[in-house]
Curated annotation (Swiss-Prot):
Zn(2+) binds at residues 93, 96, 115, 121. SUPFAM superfamilies: B-box zinc-binding domain, Concanavalin A-like lectins/glucanases, RING/U-box. This is Putative tripartite motif-containing protein 49B. Residues 269-452 form the B30.2/SPRY domain. GO terms for cellular component: cytoplasm. A zinc finger (B box-type) spans 88-129. Keywords: Metal-binding, Zinc, Zinc-finger. The keyword Zinc applies. SMART domains: BBOX (SM00336), RING (SM00184), SPRY (SM00449). InterPro entries: B30.2/SPRY (IPR001870), B30.2/SPRY_sf (IPR043136), Butyrophylin_SPRY (IPR003879), ConA-like_dom_sf (IPR013320), SPRY_dom (IPR003877), TRIM/RBCC (IPR050143), Znf_B-box (IPR000315), Znf_RING (IPR001841). The gene is TRIM49B.
């Protein structure tokens, strides 16, 4: 083959980032190709988009497939380079004047066939240099993939912890305000209980805030360790075959230790103390709600809205589901325009539910009519996937860091005050009060259950 053509052929197999032959090559949607490790390292801290280093176009591809054609060609090019290296005069066996073709895994040396069968090496494990290099490189790539997956998991967890830390003080203040407002509706002799409960809530809030900071720092430190180990493996993977074999050492063992004891995000629970007489006060406004399930487009439409609110990618702290759900939605037979009303719902040990009240137009809309986000939905919901659970309220969407109610949940609707309050009946404690609700009467109770 003409040397010029050979050089062009070789250039096509060179990664533009590391300037070495491709290692596990991937081709992104703009058409340019890179080593997978080089592309990943170029991703840096951007969770969604990265710019192509060749054309600067952005790509959001994450699950990249290996370009098998480039991988085979790059492997062939590396074999040619290895063969040329081993065929050189300097690499001939000094004793037998033969080409070294075998690799001794015990002392990590290159041997000719005669040396590999000598008394010194007879009991050692040998294999052809070419296959040994491929095997070692594949082990490195597998370990790098594990490291990258852990790095991505740690990155997601760090984002969750950063968001929680940033919003935590505001969340604690919202809880304090809601509990103060509830005590204002109670008799004056509750003053000492109110003071005690608020002080305990503040103390718990400060303790959790401190733990969130520590958790975030651990994840940030682990991010640097994971990246450093990944870069070290990448550097080893790109070494010429002979150098890779001789320098391999304990790098796999060290990388395995990095994967141990990965920090996990906290599951903060800011439980509030019981409010004496809370249920007795609310029972003065007790009503019985009759639910009717209807098979209609509006039901399907609303369930999809609820599901998207629960698992929307804009809320990193909320679990994401990949399963296709089956949704059950029931409307209350009653409607409310004024006054105060209280009812309870038995949730038991179930997950993936939401209930509350909504503006009437939700029932009248069909799936082709657009409603902005959660406007007019005043709900308490609970969702769970394989790794976490979340309790939330809507209008606006707000995660509630409290223990999940395990039996009955009460709802108190105050049409004049424009508030919807949720209480844990067993604990006689306030979960949250949605203030300043944008009611557009009549209001109708709803209950939604999503099965995954």
């Amino acid at each position: 083959m003409n040397s010029g053509i050979l050089q062009v052929f070789q250039r096509e197999l060179i990664c533009p980032i590391c300037m070495n032959y491709f290692i596990d090559p991937v081709t992104i949607d703009c058409g340019h190709s890179f080593c997978r490790p080089c592309f990943y390292l170029n991703w840096k801290d951007s969770p969604f988009l990265v710019q192509c280093s060749e054309c600067t176009k952005s790509t959001g591809q994450i699950n990249l497939k290996t370009n098998i054609h480039f991988k085979k060609m790059a492997s062939l090019a590396r074999k040619v380079s290895l063969w040329l290296f081993l065929s050189s005069e300097e690499q001939m066996c000094g004793t037998h004047r033969e080409t070294k073709k075998m690799f001794c895994e015990v002392d990590r040396s290159l041997l000719c066939l005669l040396c590999s069968s000598s008394q010194e090496h007879r009991d050692h494990r040998h294999c052809p240099i070419e296959s040994a290099a491929e095997e070692h490189q594949e082990k490195l790539l597998q370990k790098m993939q594990s490291l990258w997956e852990k790095a991505c998991e740690n990155h997601r967890n760090l984002n969750v912890e950063t968001t929680r830390t940033r919003c935590w003080k505001d969340y604690v203040n919202l809880r304090l305000e809601a509990i103060r407002a509830e005590y204002q509706k109670m008799p004056a002799f509750h003053h000492e209980e109110e003071k005690h409960n608020l002080e305990m809530l503040k103390k718990k809030g400060k303790d959790i805030f401190h733990r969130l900071h520590l958790s975030k720092a651990k994840m940030a430190h682990r991010r640097e360790i994971l990246r450093g180990m990944y870069e070290e493996l990448n550097e080893m993977c790109h070494k010429p075959d002979v150098e890779l074999l001789q320098a391999f050492g304990d790098i796999l063992h060290r990388s395995e230790s990095v994967l141990l004891h990965m920090p996990q995000p906290l599951n903060p629970e800011l439980s509030a103390g019981p409010i004496t007489g809370l249920r007795d006060r609310l029972n003065q406004f007790r009503v019985h709600i009759t639910l009717h399930h209807e098979e209609a487009n509006s039901d399907i439409f609303l369930c999809e809205i609820l599901r998207s609110m629960c698992i929307g990618c804009d809320h990193q702290d909320v679990p994401y589901f990949t399963a296709t759900p089956r949704s059950f939605l029931a409307w209350g037979a009653q409607t409310f325009t004024s006054g105060k009303y209280y009812w309870e719902v038995h949730v038991g040990d179930s997950w993936n539910w939401a209930f509350g009240v909504c503006n009437m137009y939700w029932k009248e809309k069909n799936q082709n009519e657009k409603i902005d986000g959660e406007d007019g939905l005043f709900l308490l919901g609970c969702v769970k996937n394989d790794i976490q659970r979340s309790l939330f309220t809507t209008s606006p969407l707000l995660l509630q860091y409290i223990p999940r109610p395990t039996s009955r949940v009460g709802l108190f609707l105050d049409c004049e005050a424009k508030t919807v309050s949720f209480v844990d009946v067993n604990q006689s404690s306030l979960i949250y009060t949605i203030p300043n609700c944008s009611f557009s009467p009549p209001l109708r109770p709803i209950f939604c259950c999503i099965h995954f």
